[in-house]
C-alpha cells in the first residue's frame, strides 16, 4: 500500500528514467532544423568529427544528442523514414546497458541504428545479435545504406563463412550475426593454434534483438564444440529393441501406491524412472539379448555404460516425440527449438540421447561426441564490456535480467495508443471440443473479412489444426519448422483480408504483419515494375487495409497457453501494431500440457461444480487467474533452474576464463622458453621429491625407482646409483642440481640439431596441444562431477560448495598434469639432422616403390590376401601426411620434409 502511494507521488523508476530521457529528446528535436541545412557531405563529415572528439577525451554520452540527430537526418535522406520520439527514447535506453521493451511494430530495427552508430564511433566494434541468419542478413542489408552513408562499415557473420571473411566481418564497425555464431566463433578462437586463425576482436558492445529469446529461453542451452568419441551405435540399436516391451505407469511407486508398469515419467523435470518390476524385466531382456551375463546387475560398476544406454533409450521413447521435439528429414534427426518452433540443423542432444532417438527412428546412428569446448549464452554475453537488448516482452522477466545480467528493463511507450482487445480465455474439457470451437471462431472471423493468425506450440499441433481446417474447407497457410524457408513471405501476407495463417510458436518473428498484406512484397514479385503499376498496387492495398481495419484488424488465436506468459504476450503482440485495431483469444482444454501438469485439479474441480456439458466452455476471471498462477509457478521454477545452472557454470566459467586468457597470451608470444625452463624446474623437483623425500636419510631414497621414472618419462638415462657410489660426499641438494643440469644439457643438444627457431615453434605447439587435450578431459570430468554432486546433499553437505571445492582441486591437478605432460613430451622428442631425415625419406620411398610393384604383381595373380598384407605392411612403414614430421620440428610431415615428395 505504502509503495503504491509513493509511486503515485514520485512516479515509478521507469517513469523517472523516461522523464530524464525526454529532456534529451527535446534537445535532439531542437537540432533538427540545423541538421536539415547540412549538405550530404557535411552530414557524412560528422562521423569523423565525433571520432576526433572522442580521441581528445570527450565522453561518449556527451555525443548522444548530436549523434542521434545526425542518424535521424541521415535516415530521412536514405530511407525517407524519420525516427519517432519513442524510438529516440529506445535508442537512449539501449545505450545505457538496459533492456528496452518496445511493442511489436514500433520499429525496433530502426531504433537499433541509433546506439549502433553511437557505439561504433569508438572503433571497438558493435555486435548486433539476432535469432536467425535470415534476420541477420535482412537487417544488415536494410541498414547498410544508412551506415555507409555515414561512413561506417557493415559486416555479416554467417555460419560456414571462411576465416578471412569472418575476420573482415568482425573488423567492420558494425557486425550483424546470430547468437550461436558469435558464441561458436569465441570458442573456436580459443582453440586456434596461431594468432592469425582468430577472427574476433575484444568483445565491446552487444546489442541483442529479441533479448528474451536469447538470454532467457536459450540460457540453459550450452554452446558445445565437440569431436568424435568411440563408436557405440550397435549398442544403441540392441537396447532400442528392448524398450517397447516396457509398460508406462502414471506415477512413481511409493508407500501408498504400487503400480503395474515398468517405468514412470516425471513430465515436470523430464525424467524417466524405472520401477523395481521394470529393472527386473530390463535385466531379463538384456540377458536374453546376450548384452549382459546371467546373474549380473544393471547397477554394477561394470555396467555403468549399459545403464547410460538404457536411460537414453527410455527417454527417447517416453519423452521425445516426432514432429514435436524433432523431425526426421533426409534420414536425419533434426531438433526443433521448443521456443521458436524452428529446426536447429547441426545441433545434437548430448549424453547419447540423440543416438537413442536415431535408433528409435531407424535412421543412421552418428557417433557420440566428446566436448572440446563449451560456454552458456549467460556467460558468453557477460564477457561484453557493454550489453543491451530489445524485445516486445521483457517486463515479466525484469527480475531475471536484473539479477543475472545486471540489466534494468525500461518499458518504452508506444507511438500511438494500443487499442487491441484481449478477450478472456475459454476453457474446454477436451482437446477435440477446443479444436472445434477454434474452427467455428475462424469461420466467423473470415466471413467478415478479418485475417486470423493461429499460434500453436508444436508442429504436431499445427498439423492437427491444419487437417481440421482442410476438412472444414477453409483455405490457410501453415508456418512451421518443416517449411520455414518461405517464412517471411507467408508472414508478410498474413494480414490479407480473410487470410488464415497457422504459425508454430513465434515462427516469423521479426517480420511485421501489415493489415491488408504487404504491397512491397507484391512490387518485389514484379520484374520491372512501372510507376503506374506501383501506384495501382498501393491503391489496391489501401482498400484492403481499410477493409481489414473495419472488420476488426488481425485476430490472434492461441491454441493453448505456453509455459511462459511472455511467449503468450509475444503471440498477442503480433496484432494491434502502431495503434491498429485487433483482438486476441486463447482456447484451452483440460488435456493441454500446462493444465494437466500444473493447474488441473483446481480448474477441473471448478468445472465439475459448474456442471459443464460437452462443447461448453468456461469463461471466468477466476480461471484466467488460476492459469496465470500456473504459468507463474512454471516461470519461477524455470528461473530457479537457470539460476542454479549459472551458479554451477560460474565455477567452470572462472576456470574457462583463466585457461583462455593463458592460452591467448601463449598464442601472442613467439618464445616460451622461459616458461618451459621454469616449469621444468617444478616438474623435476616434484619427480625427485617422490623418490628422494626432502631432508631425508639416504636409506629412505628409492634410487632404482627414480632412475626408471626418469628413463620412462623424460628419456633421461642417468647413472645416479653409480654417482652416489663414486662420490660419497654427493648430498641431496647437489644431486638434484646435477639431475636438472643433465636434463637441460640433453635438451640443449637437441636444440643445436634443429635450431633455436624450430625448437621455440615446437615448444609452443606442444604447450597448446597439451593444454587443449587436458582441458577437454577436464570438461568431461567436471560434467560427471556436476551430474552426481546433488547426492552430497544426503550427507548434509552443500552440493554447490562441494562442487566448488572439488572442481578447484581438479583444476589444480590439471595444471600440474599440464606441466608434467609438456616437459615429458619435450624431453622424449627424437630429433635428427636434416641429412639423416633425407636419407630415411629416400629409403622410405624406395621401399614404398618396391612394395607397390610387388602389390601390383600380387593383384595380377588375384591374390587379394597377400595384397592386403602388403598394404598393411606399407601402412606401417609410411609416414602419414598429417603425422608429425620425423625430424622433430613439430610441424605436420606434409608441411615439412613431406614437401620434397
Curated annotation (Swiss-Prot):
Gene3D superfamilies from the UniProt entry: Helical scaffold and wing domains of SecA (1.10.3060.10), P-loop containing nucleotide triphosphate hydrolases (3.40.50.300), SecA, preprotein cross-linking domain (3.90.1440.10)
Primary subcellular site in the record, as a coarse category: membrane
Biased composition (Basic residues): 891-901
Annotated stretches, region: Disordered: 859-901
GO molecular function: ATP binding; metal ion binding; protein-exporting ATPase activity
Pfam families: P-loop_SecA, SEC-C, SecA_DEAD, SecA_PP_bind, SecA_SW
Residues binding ATP, per UniProt: 87, 105-109, 512
Gene Ontology BP annotations: intracellular protein transmembrane transport; protein import; protein targeting; protein transport by the Sec complex
Membrane-protein topology: Peripheral membrane protein
GO cellular component: cell envelope Sec protein transport complex; cytosol; plasma membrane
Catalytic activity: ATP + H2O + cellular proteinSide 1 = ADP + phosphate + cellular proteinSide 2
Keyword Iron attached: no
Function: Part of the Sec protein translocase complex. Interacts with the SecYEG preprotein conducting channel. Has a central role in coupling the hydrolysis of ATP to the transfer of proteins into and across the cell membrane, serving both as a receptor for the preprotein-SecB complex and as an ATP-driven molecular motor driving the stepwise translocation of polypeptide chains across the membrane.
UniProt-recorded name of the protein: Protein translocase subunit SecA
Biological source species: Escherichia coli O6:H1 (strain CFT073 / ATCC 700928 / UPEC)
Lineage of the organism: Bacteria, Pseudomonadati, Pseudomonadota, Gammaproteobacteria, Enterobacterales
Amino acid at each position: 500500500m505504502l509503495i503504491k502511494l509513493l509511486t503515485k507521488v514520485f512516479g515509478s523508476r521507469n517513469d523517472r528514467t523516461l522523464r530524464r530521457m525526454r529532456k534529451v529528446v527535446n534537445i535532439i528535436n531542437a537540432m533538427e532544423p540545423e541538421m536539415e541545412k547540412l549538405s550530404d557531405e557535411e552530414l557524412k563529415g560528422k562521423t569523423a568529427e565525433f571520432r576526433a572528439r572522442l580521441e581528445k577525451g570527450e565522453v561518449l554520452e556527451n555525443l548522444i544528442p548530436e549523434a542521434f540527430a545526425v542518424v535521424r537526418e541521415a535516415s530521412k535522406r536514405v530511407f525517407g523514414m524519420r525516427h519517432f520520439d519513442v524510438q529516440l527514447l529506445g535508442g537512449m535506453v539501449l545505450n545505457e546497458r538496459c533492456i528496452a521493451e518496445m511493442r511489436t511494430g514500433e520499429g525496433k530495427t530502426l531504433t537499433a541504428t541509433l546506439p549502433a552508430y553511437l557505439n561504433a564511433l569508438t572503433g571497438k566494434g558493435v555486435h548486433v545479435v539476432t535469432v536467425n541468419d535470415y534476420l541477420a542478413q535482412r537487417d544488415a542489408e536494410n541498414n547498410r545504406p544508412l551506415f555507409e552513408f555515414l561512413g561506417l562499415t557493415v559486416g555479416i557473420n554467417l555460419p560456414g563463412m571462411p576465416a578471412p571473411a569472418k575476420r573482415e566481418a568482425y573488423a567492420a564497425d558494425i557486425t550483424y550475426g546470430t547468437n550461436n555464431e558469435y558464441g561458436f566463433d569465441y570458442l573456436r578462437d580459443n582453440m586456434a593454434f596461431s594468432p592469425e586463425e582468430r577472427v574476433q576482436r575484444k568483445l565491446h558492445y552487444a546489442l541483442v534483438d529479441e533479448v528474451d529469446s536469447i538470454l532467457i529461453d536459450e540460457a540453459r542451452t550450452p554452446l558445445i564444440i565437440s569431436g568424435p568419441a568411440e563408436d557405440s551405435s550397435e549398442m544403441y540399436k540392441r537396447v532400442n529393441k528392448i524398450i517397447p516391451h516396457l509398460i508406462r505407469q502414471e506415477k512413481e511407486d511409493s508407500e501408498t501406491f504400487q503400480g503395474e508398469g515398468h517405468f514412470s515419467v516425471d513430465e515436470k523435470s523430464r525424467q524417466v524412472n524405472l520401477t523395481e518390476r521394470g529393472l527386473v524385466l530390463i535385466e531379463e531382456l538384456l540377458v536374453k539379448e546376450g548384452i549382459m551375463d546371467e546373474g549380473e546387475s544393471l547397477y554394477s560398476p561394470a555396467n555403468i555404460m549399459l545403464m547410460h544406454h538404457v536411460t537414453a533409450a527410455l527417454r527417447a521413447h517416453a519423452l521425445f516425440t516426432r514432429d514435436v521435439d524433432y523431425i526426421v528429414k533426409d534420414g536425419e534427426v533434426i531438433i526443433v527449438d521448443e521456443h521458436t518452433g524452428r529446426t536447429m540443423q547441426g545441433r545434437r542432444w548430448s549424453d547419447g540421447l540423440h543416438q537413442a532417438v536415431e535408433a528409435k527412428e531407424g535412421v543412421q546412428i552418428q557417433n557420440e561426441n566428446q566436448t572440446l569446448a563449451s560456454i552458456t549464452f549467460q556467460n558468453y554475453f557477460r564477457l561484453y564490456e557493454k550489453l543491451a537488448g530489445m524485445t516486445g516482452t521483457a517486463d515479466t522477466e525484469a527480475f531475471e535480467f536484473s539479477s543475472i545480467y545486471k540489466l534494468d528493463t525500461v518499458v518504452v511507450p508506444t507511438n500511438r495508443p494500443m487499442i487491441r482487445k484481449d478477450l478472456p480465455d475459454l476453457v474446454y474439457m477436451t482437446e477435440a471440443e477446443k479444436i472445434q470451437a477454434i474452427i467455428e471462431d475462424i469461420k466467423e472471423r473470415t466471413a467478415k473479412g478479418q485475417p486470423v493468425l493461429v499460434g500453436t506450440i508444436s508442429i504436431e499441433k499445427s498439423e492437427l489444426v491444419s487437417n481440421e481446417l482442410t476438412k472444414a474447407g477453409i483455405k490457410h497457410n501453415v508456418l512451421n519448422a518443416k517449411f520455414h524457408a518461405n517464412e517471411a513471405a507467408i508472414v508478410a501476407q498474413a494480414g490479407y483480408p480473410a487470410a488464415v495463417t497457422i504459425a508454430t510458436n513465434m515462427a516469423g518473428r521479426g517480420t511485421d504483419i501489415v493489415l491488408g498484406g504487404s504491397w512491397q512484397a507484391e512490387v518485389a514479385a514484379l520484374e520491372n515494375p512501372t510507376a503506374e503499376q506501383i501506384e495501382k498496387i498501393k491503391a489496391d492495398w489501401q482498400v484492403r487495409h481499410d477493409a481489414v481495419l473495419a472488420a476488426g484488424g488481425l485476430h490472434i488465436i492461441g491454441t493453448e497457453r505456453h509455459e511462459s506468459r511472455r511467449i503468450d504476450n509475444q503471440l498477442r503482440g503480433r496484432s494491434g501494431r502502431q495503434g491498429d485495431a485487433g483482438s486476441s483469444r486463447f482456447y484451452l482444454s483440460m488435456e493441454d500440457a500446462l493444465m494437466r501438469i500444473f493447474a488441473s485439479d483446481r480448474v477441473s474441480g471448478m468445472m465439475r461444480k459448474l456442471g459443464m456439458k460437452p462443447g461448453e466452455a468456461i469463461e471466468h476471471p477466476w480461471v484466467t487467474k488460476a492459469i496465470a498462477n500456473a504459468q507463474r509457478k512454471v516461470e519461477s521454477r524455470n528461473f530457479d533452474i537457470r539460476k542454479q545452472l549459472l551458479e554451477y557454470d560460474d565455477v567452470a566459467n572462472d576456470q574457462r576464463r583463466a585457461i583462455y586468457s593463458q592460452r591467448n597470451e601463449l598464442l601472442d608470444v613467439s618464445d616460451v622458453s622461459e616458461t618451459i625452463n621454469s616449469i621444468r624446474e617444478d616438474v623435476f623437483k616434484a619427480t625427485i621429491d617422490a623418490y628422494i623425500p626432502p631432508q631425508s636419510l639416504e636409506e629412505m631414497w628409492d634410487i632404482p625407482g627414480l632412475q626408471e621414472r626418469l628413463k620412462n618419462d623424460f628419456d633421461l638415462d642417468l647413472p645416479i646409483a653409480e654417482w652416489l657410489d663414486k662420490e660419497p660426499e654427493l648430498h641431496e641438494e647437489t644431486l638434484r642440481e646435477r639431475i636438472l643440469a643433465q636434463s637441460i644439457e640433453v635438451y640443449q643438444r637437441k636444440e643445436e640439431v634443429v635450431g633455436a627457431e624450430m625448437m621455440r615453434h615446437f615448444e609452443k605447439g606442444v604447450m597448446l596441444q597439451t593444454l587443449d587435450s587436458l582441458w577437454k578431459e577436464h570438461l568431461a570430468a567436471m560434467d560427471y562431477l556436476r551430474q552426481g554432486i546433488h547426492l552430497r546433499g544426503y550427507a548434509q553437505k552443500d552440493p554447490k560448495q562441494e562442487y566448488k571445492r572439488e572442481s578447484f582441486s581438479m583444476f589444480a591437478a590439471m595444471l600440474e598434469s599440464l606441466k608434467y605432460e609438456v616437459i615429458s613430451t619435450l624431453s622424449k622428442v627424437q630429433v635428427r639432422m636434416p641429412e639423416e631425415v633425407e636419407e630415411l625419406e629416400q629409403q622410405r620411398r624406395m621401399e614404398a616403390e618396391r612394395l607397390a610393384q610387388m602389390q601390383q604383381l600380387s593383384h595380377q595373380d588375384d591374390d587379394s590376401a597377400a595384397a592386403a598384407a602388403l598394404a598393411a605392411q606399407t601402412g606401417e612403414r609410411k609416414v602419414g601426411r598429417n603425422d608429425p614430421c620425423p625430424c622433430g620440428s613439430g610441424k605436420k610431415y606434409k608441411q615439412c620434409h613431406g614437401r620434397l615428395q
